[in-house]
């Protein structure tokens, strides 16, 4: 058995910075060559403590940024201009990429289209809602105003 320090998330073993004990072949043939871990040493453990402290500080900063973005998203109505036919029926539907682009153009900030969830397909003009999962614990609900292009 050999001790290694994980440098990335490895399912079943742990998160970056964890010191784990694995079989020699697993560490020598898989973890170390793939860059998932480094061989344990006293100096390496001190370095890992510094990395964990820096990661905790970054984590705190990203939480504050996400809270700020959430308040800006919920305070403003995002306007989407799309092609529509008679009666306000859209040609197609509004996609998450359209919402992400509209949020960025409105000056609120950048949002990843994969984090946007639309509860019901948007196939008509009017007011709608969508949720954006900024982090696992921070979810913003945005108001959308879908308008027909002229």
UniProtKB/Swiss-Prot annotation:
<comment type="similarity">
    <text>Belongs to the bacterial ribosomal protein bL9 family.</text>
</comment>
<dbReference type="Pfam" id="PF01281">
    <property type="entry name" value="Ribosomal_L9_N"/>
</dbReference>
<protein>
    <recommendedName>
        <fullName>Large ribosomal subunit protein bL9</fullName>
    </recommendedName>
</protein>
<comment type="function">
    <text>Binds to the 23S rRNA.</text>
</comment>
<dbReference type="GO" id="GO:0019843">
    <property type="term" value="F:rRNA binding"/>
</dbReference>
<dbReference type="GO" id="GO:0006412">
    <property type="term" value="P:translation"/>
</dbReference>
<keyword id="KW-0694">RNA-binding</keyword>
<dbReference type="InterPro" id="IPR036791">
    <property type="entry name" value="Ribosomal_bL9_C_sf"/>
</dbReference>
<dbReference type="InterPro" id="IPR009027">
    <property type="entry name" value="Ribosomal_bL9/RNase_H1_N"/>
</dbReference>
<dbReference type="InterPro" id="IPR036935">
    <property type="entry name" value="Ribosomal_bL9_N_sf"/>
</dbReference>
<dbReference type="InterPro" id="IPR020070">
    <property type="entry name" value="Ribosomal_bL9_N"/>
</dbReference>
<dbReference type="InterPro" id="IPR000244">
    <property type="entry name" value="Ribosomal_bL9"/>
</dbReference>
<dbReference type="InterPro" id="IPR020594">
    <property type="entry name" value="Ribosomal_bL9_bac/chp"/>
</dbReference>
<dbReference type="GO" id="GO:0003735">
    <property type="term" value="F:structural constituent of ribosome"/>
</dbReference>
<dbReference type="InterPro" id="IPR020069">
    <property type="entry name" value="Ribosomal_bL9_C"/>
</dbReference>
<keyword id="KW-0689">Ribosomal protein</keyword>
<keyword id="KW-0687">Ribonucleoprotein</keyword>
<dbReference type="Pfam" id="PF03948">
    <property type="entry name" value="Ribosomal_L9_C"/>
</dbReference>
<dbReference type="GO" id="GO:1990904">
    <property type="term" value="C:ribonucleoprotein complex"/>
</dbReference>
<dbReference type="GO" id="GO:0005840">
    <property type="term" value="C:ribosome"/>
</dbReference>
<keyword id="KW-0699">rRNA-binding</keyword>
